[in-house]
C-alpha cells in the first residue's frame, strides 16, 4: 500500500473514533469540567442558562403564561454540575452551556 493512501485511511480512522467519543457520556467535575467548558466555548464566554425567555412576557399581561414565581418549590434549577458532574453527559449537552 502506498504511503498517501495509508495516511488518508489512518486519518479517517482517527476522525471516526473522535466522532464516536463525542457522543459518549462522561462525568465532568471540578477542574476537568472547567477546562472542558473552556475548550468547547473558546469563542464565547461561559454563561449560566437563563430561567425562561417567556418570563418577560408574563409581566406584559399574557394571562395564559405563569408568573415567574409560580410554584417555585416544584422548579429545581439544574446547572452544569447537576447535568455533567453528578450524572454523566455528552459534549453536546456540555456545549449548551456556552
UniProtKB/Swiss-Prot annotation:
Supply the InterPro entries for this chain.
Bombyxin, Insulin-like, Insulin-like_sf, Insulin_CS, Insulin_family
Q: What is any one of the record's Gene Ontology cellular component terms? A: extracellular space
Query: Is the keyword Chaperone assigned to this protein?
Result: no
Q: Where in the cell is it found?
A: Secreted
Q: Name one Pfam family in it.
A: Insulin
Major subcellular location class? secreted
Q: Which Gene3D superfamilies does the record cross-reference, listed alphabetically?
A: Insulin-like (1.10.100.10)
Question: Signal peptide: which range, if any?
Answer: 1-19
Q: Which PANTHER family match?
A: INSULIN-LIKE PEPTIDE 1-RELATED, INSULIN-LIKE PEPTIDE 2-RELATED
Question: What is annotated about its quaternary structure and interactions?
Answer: Heterodimer of a B chain and an A chain linked by two disulfide bonds.
What this protein is reported to do is described as: PTTH is a brain peptide responsible for activation of prothoracic glands to produce ecdysone in insects.
Q: What is this protein called?
A: Bombyxin E-1
User: Can you name the source organism?
Assistant: Bombyx mori (Silk moth)
